[in-house]
């Protein structure tokens, strides 16, 4: 199973996160995309831990429920493995190799770049373009993941009634979805855009330049910290705390006791991720921050981050320019939109 090889027929994008399964199906007409079907189905606690599937039956059942609720009739899907489960390298290769020869050469040379036995990994590659100052060579992006990581995604989809046609890398799916945001941002050519995806247990920083990912890093921190604090402080179950976090109903003291400290901790984590990027690169600032993920819409977070970093900050909506099928609930979709970046990137693989 290739990690990011485009395949036909049409695909439904399936993002398996630590707390939910997100399904999205798009169509395209006249150069414009339309949301045909979507669903978000919660996962039981610890079914997926730090993006690794632990309880495959529970994940498969959640996919099955989400598929039924979405109303989609597609049975071919694209999913993704987390960046932490993938090794990527940019490797120079002769530009005159055919795809078959290039694939053979990569299989031969992969041992140099992959720290696992080659028969235990799934490999894929993408030609990025000529090497600067040496047009006889091409830069080739090599991606590899332990086969077990890929197989778990494939098996979960199968249990949910879907056939995996593409297993992508989350960072590449994020890059794919970023194309839907690019014209919403007031940044020039060569600007650095930091996309911060704040999930339940992981926060991922992707830095893009001219819509290409130049850096990606994950940090174990996310919305579950706030859910755990609500459980501890107010004596609620995991499900009750998650519901209260989304819909309200907590005591007035919640904002000062739990929410504000969480926002401050989250901003510290984001600042730390950016410092890692600056320390290992030629850059010392970014030009724009885009907040994505389930925590992106926390009231006041963007303004606090903008003040802390001195950089414009917006909340991602990769669906803003898309039309909606009548069967899609617009209000629910708008609320979920910042958390659908990876699902959008995966659904867009239908049109590669």
Description of each model-found segment:
Residues 2-42, 75-80, 184-215, 222-225, ...:
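Gly/Thr-rich phosphate-binding beta-strand-loop-beta motif of the actin/hexokinase/Hsp70
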Residues 76, 80-182, 288, 318-324, ...:
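Active-site neighborhood for divalent-cation/phosphate handling
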Residues 303-343:
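Conserved phosphate-binding/catalytic loops in two-lobed NTP-binding clefts
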Residues 63-75, 160, 236, 271-288:
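Phosphate/pyrophosphate-binding loops at sites that engage ATP/ADP/AMP, CoA/4′-phosphopantetheine
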Residues 48, 148-176, 212-252:
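Glycine-rich phosphate-binding loop plus the immediately following alpha-helix
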Residues 1-109, 151, 163:
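Non-catalytic, solvent-exposed interaction/assembly segments
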Residues 259-262, 284-314, 318-320:
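Glycine-rich phosphate-binding loops at beta-strand->alpha-helix junctions
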Residues 228, 232, 241-288, 295, ...:
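Adenine-nucleotide phosphate-binding core of ATP-dependent small-molecule kinases
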